[in-house]
């Protein structure tokens, strides 16, 4: 694997952790909007398909407010120099409640050099 691909892999892992820090915060939408491509799509369990404009409504019930989370079995696919997908298993807790799901996020890098979410999906296990 070329060294640039290794750097892209590491960048995407850092971005995914930034995403999950935002997802588990008290007010996710502002940071999620910043991280997202304008046409990004979000697929959460038991929620309608969400776009950037509907993030505030999707998070109104605080369904994703976890105290802790851990990403396991992280795999990165570098699509090209400006795009990649990361998949993993997520384990999160809220009080005594456990949340276990698989996750996948596709990231694209804009002309400004910033990574933006193109799509994000979680599937309950």
Residue map of PLM features:
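ATP/adenylate-binding site constellation spanning eukaryotic-like Ser/Thr protein kinases
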Residues: 37
């Amino acid at each position: 694997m070329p060294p640039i691909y290794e750097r892209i892999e590491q960048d995407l892992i850092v971005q995914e952790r930034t995403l999950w820090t935002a997802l588990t915060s008290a007010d996710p939408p502002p940071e999620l909007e910043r991280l997202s491509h304008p046409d990004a799509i979000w697929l959460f369990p038991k929620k309608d398909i969400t776009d950037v404009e509907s993030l505030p409504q999707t998070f109104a019930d605080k369904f994703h407010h976890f105290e802790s989370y851990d990403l396991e079995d992280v795999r990165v696919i570098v699509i090209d120099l400006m795009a990649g997908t990361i998949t993993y298993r997520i384990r999160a807790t809220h009080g005594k409640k456990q949340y276990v799901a698989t996750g996948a996020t596709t990231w694209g890098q804009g002309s400004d050099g910033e990574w933006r979410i193109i799509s994000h999906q979680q599937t309950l296990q």
